[in-house]
Amino acid sequence: MAGSNIKVQIEKQLSERILLIDGGMGTMIQGYKFEEKDYRGGRFNQWHCDLKGNNDLLVLSQPQIIRDIHEAYLEAGADILETNTFNATTIAMADYDMESLSEEINFEAAKLAREVADKWTEKTPNKPRYVAGVLGPTNRTCSISPDVNDPGFRNVSFDELVEAYSESTRALIRGGSDLILIETIFDTLNAKACSFAVESVFEELGITLPVMISGTITDASGRTLSGQTTEAFYNALRHVKPISFGLNCALGPDELREYVSELSRISECYVSAHPNAGLPNAFGEYDLSPEDMAEHVAEWASSGFLNLIGGCCGTTPEHIRQMALVVEGVKPRQLPELPVACRLSGLEPLTIEKDSLFINVGERTNVTGSARFKRLIKEELYDEALSVAQEQVENGAQIIDINMDEGMLDAEACMVRFLNLCASEPEISKVPVMVDSSKWEVIEAGLKCIQGKGIVNSISLKEGKEKFVHQAKLIRRYGAAVIVMAFDEVGQADTRERKIEICTNAYNILVDEVGFPPEDIIFDPNIFAVATGIDEHNNYAVDFIEAVGDIKRTLPHAMISGGVSNVSFSFRGNNYVREAIHAVFLYHCFKNGMDMGIVNAGQLEIYDNVPEDLREAVEDVVLNRRDDSTERLLDIATEYLERAVGKVEDKSALEWRDWPVEKRLEHSLVKGITEFIVEDTEEARINAERPIEVIEGPLMDGMNVVGDLFGEGKMFLPQVVKSARVMKQAVAHLEPFINASKEVGATNGKILLATVKGDVHDIGKNIVGVVLQCNNYEIIDLGVMVSCETILKVAKEENVDIIGLSGLITPSLDEMVHVAKEMERQGFDLPLLIGGATTSKAHTAVKIEQNYSQPVVYVNNASRAVGVCTSLLSNELKPSFVEKLDIDYERVREQHSRKQPRTKPVTLEVARANKVAIDWASYTPPVPLKPGVHIFDNFDVSTLRNYIDWTPFFMTWSLVGKYPKILEHEEVGEEAKRLFKDANDLLDRVEKEGLLKARGMCALFPASSVGDDIEVYTDESRTTVAKVLHNLRQQTEKPKGFNYCLSDYIAPKESGKNDWIGGFAVTGGIGERELADEYKANGDDYNAIMIQAVADRLAEAFAEYLHEKVRKEIWGYSPNETLSNDDLIREKYQGIRPAPGYPACPEHTEKGALWELMNVEESIGMSLTSSYAMWPGASVSGMYFSHPDSRYFAIAQIQQDQAESYADRKGWNMLEAEKWLGPNLN
């Protein structure tokens, strides 16, 4: 069957059911207890060496036995037979001096399996059987030395592996294989050689078969033998585009589960697993019975991990039979829709997504850029050269660039030697490698040494399209990303226009002709030196910065890199000024979208730390702001050079040692100076009442400064790494004193609290924690966005008595269900508490409680927490408490099952026919006075205070009543007054001391409605759609009203009316988390919660203020509006500002569209979690509608037809749609 046809057929099968791979071939052969004569058969009776153990030879010497084993597995229910060729490569066959038989063995093995499979397909045509031609790992490793005394030595080369695998692949295809299975991969470089061979043979034969890949996690470390994590391994081989990616061998199902689970999450293709029958016992035998193994498989299948399942060592046809029984009828894993990202790896993964921070590529392992490194390589001092690479990684390099291009070096040999040595150093090889050379043969030699997914630096069009395409195809086959220089046959691009022209041409060739993934294309638009004295060079930096923005906008998913030090080449010898130029240049490049840069990771200056006079002079040069900018910088550079060489005393370098100790500590943290940290920390400890105060005070203050600079793009990862190192030294000095002062006492119990993965909200959780602590419970608070794995791991390690989960947004409900299921699966016997704004007793009873056999208690407020915990941990109270709980939940479930919608549901067609009736012909939408994006940075807190709605503030503290009446309430009035005063005192401090920062933005875009959705355009020509905002429509019977949808309030495209829509995002919480943590560390939980509550109020106030400003000034459709704050709270204005996740648009992922439209994260630092919660937590976002008839409404329940329509418009499968629409889907 042709390759394309077989792929289609197998994919159809995989979409419908879980397919079964066969089990252990070696296990079955061992059951025959063959002796030497059996292996020889008749043909090899006179062979000159022992053949016992050569199982692959049996296809020639005992073919009937292999046929019988295949038959047994197909009879048991297997869909896919593996050929008996695990060790049939020439390399593995060399152990028996049988290299010459490799081709014949592969051919005969495939032919035999083909005959058996066809026989069974003929028996049961509705269940076709397939043959997977097996390519095993060989008995050698391409990335590990077999000689402990020479870590750079290899007993097999990439090319030798390619040759061996090519011969086997040709024979397997000729013998009739339907698929190629690269399995039991313990060294990913071997597998990369194998995949290279397979793809080369496909090209040679003009046929492409589906490829299956299966790796081996060797032990509890969760890594392959060559050291890669599961995700790093996946990233390294993802370029093969296999039909399935899986794991097999080494571990039993219990040990392998977490890695199969991880693979099912990250793999864009189908997932396979064929584990061993447990771990071998003391006699090397496997004890896990077919029934027990099937139990594990059933759980994997029901958890949605699997598309293919089979067995490896110790498994038999009976194991496969039992697996077939438990997976029959179970829905196979659905392929996830993952964001487009460049997925690199060393021993560990590096995923570069749209929202990733700047990636630092270490430049010092380059003989052309580092005199020290060049000397070490020339003198063959490779151990010392490795230390240069390690320093780069320790200083924050996430990728290391390696270049050996020097006239007196054998660049190819040096590259191979150094990369092989790097592979033996986990602290270096954990990061991806950038193979850098101007010589193609050196690049190829380097690619043959790296097991992860690296980057080629670089190729270009300078020698024409044909060579460019040839090299790009090979790079893709080697499994690397590529840097493309802006260079063609005319020359290097030196202007903005030329940079765009060349990069666009290269992009189109790579994507359209080569099939290169756009996310793996990294453009280097050429960084040239500025301030050279030549006028034509003055705009080089500006051209690069602007080209970065152009490329990011016009070439989807492509990334930008560059050699940063080039820009300062005119000032070589004056490192101080060079570092200042780098800091300023990077700051502006990063703001415009530059993804990565080749830098000296140990010597990056912080933008804000560049002296103001120097920074201004540098910016004049970089941004070409003055005609005399070069001369001015040269003048000031001389002064800084003299300081650097000691001719002029730099007083500022000495002054800081005379500052107060708190300021000295901050300075050391920001600058990454370790020289004085111990003596300054000791001085601070002597001055403090308690040693812990040194950490909570000056050390945390300094780290907050580092965090702010990093978040603002004025400080890069290497500096943060150095700051963290300084902090660790300070804490290490204090730890003995802190431990000596600790007192331990008895508690009422230990409770773990966590806000679940993807959710950032924790005010309620923090209040619960404080209340419980006041009642002598020990609290372990894991904070926000905590994964299930972390929660359960810590719960076991700390031996807690209760686990409490919190969440505010609706996606958190599914995560809570997941945690409950995992607790049941792992055999926990602890009570589980559920709380948070999005939770309810009904959801707890219907969705969570039934997945966990221990008590699951919905706690609706902090006041209940103590009573609940006391009952659950009391032997006397627990039985009756749990009995009442069970009765209550059963009642809730019965009520839920009988629950009928208050209004009758209607079809989507009927709902759309009853849309809001607006006479668009007689209405002209208002045109904004100031369209586009508006940013409000460090906004004045005093202004926002006038817009605060205080009623929800009191609700946070469980004081119910409307402001201002609550201040006079008979029962809670006095407490409310105290709270109100404390909040305003804190706001005074916030305002005076700048404790919190408020940032916000809004934008107004041309828009039209198209059905239930809204098209947002890039500009007023309305020709290009920037984004589509998807909406839901009410879907219940409305005899006297409309079935509302937000799109009803935007003029339909066909009306010819030019309408607009707005978006906004605001936060009052920048700095809030740090303040709250500081208060907590100081034991001040009251103010920790207070600062969060105040930050939330500021965010809502900012939203109110900004909406008013939009109505009156920016959009300007209500210029004469005069409303009091009470009127604003009552929404007496024209227009609405609905927010994704709330009743009118309850689906959270639409926040992502807003973020992209307005470039929110880069503009004001607000980000979204995996569940689309906003960070910081004290944040608000939404849309602006201006129509006078617009109003708020609730979508409530929708039906399956609308869910299908929404999924189709969003490009989702129904699994994804059900995940996000679940709370509203009837």
Curated annotation (Swiss-Prot):
GO cellular component term of the entry, any: cytosol
Hcy-binding domain ranges (all copies): 7-327
GO biological process, one term: tetrahydrofolate metabolic process
Record keywords: Amino-acid biosynthesis, Cobalamin, Cobalt, Metal-binding, Methionine biosynthesis, Methyltransferase, Repeat, S-adenosyl-L-methionine, Transferase, Zinc
Cofactor annotation: methylcob(III)alamin; Zn(2+)
Enzyme class label: transferase
Entry binding sites for Zn(2+): 249, 312-313
B12-binding domain location: 748-883
CDD domains documented for this protein: methionine_synthase_B12_BD (cd02069), MeTr (cd00740)
Reaction(s) catalysed by this chain's protein: (6S)-5-methyl-5,6,7,8-tetrahydrofolate + L-homocysteine = (6S)-5,6,7,8-tetrahydrofolate + L-methionine
Residues given in the record as S-adenosyl-L-methionine binding sites: 949, 1137, 1192-1193
Domain AdoMet activation: 899-1226
Pathway(s): Amino-acid biosynthesis; L-methionine biosynthesis via de novo pathway; L-methionine from L-homocysteine (MetH route): step 1/1
Key word Repeat present: yes
Pfam families in UniProt: B12-binding, B12-binding_2, Met_synt_B12, Pterin_bind, S-methyl_trans
Cofactor binding description: Binds 1 zinc ion per subunit.
Purpose of the protein: Catalyzes the transfer of a methyl group from methyl-cobalamin to homocysteine, yielding enzyme-bound cob(I)alamin and methionine. Subsequently, remethylates the cofactor using methyltetrahydrofolate.
Domain remark text: Modular enzyme with four functionally distinct domains. The isolated Hcy-binding domain catalyzes methyl transfer from free methylcobalamin to homocysteine. The Hcy-binding domain in association with the pterin-binding domain catalyzes the methylation of cob(I)alamin by methyltetrahydrofolate and the methylation of homocysteine. The B12-binding domain binds the cofactor. The AdoMet activation domain binds S-adenosyl-L-methionine. Under aerobic conditions cob(I)alamin can be converted to inactive cob(II)alamin.
Protein name stated in the entry: Methionine synthase
UniProt organism field: Aliivibrio fischeri
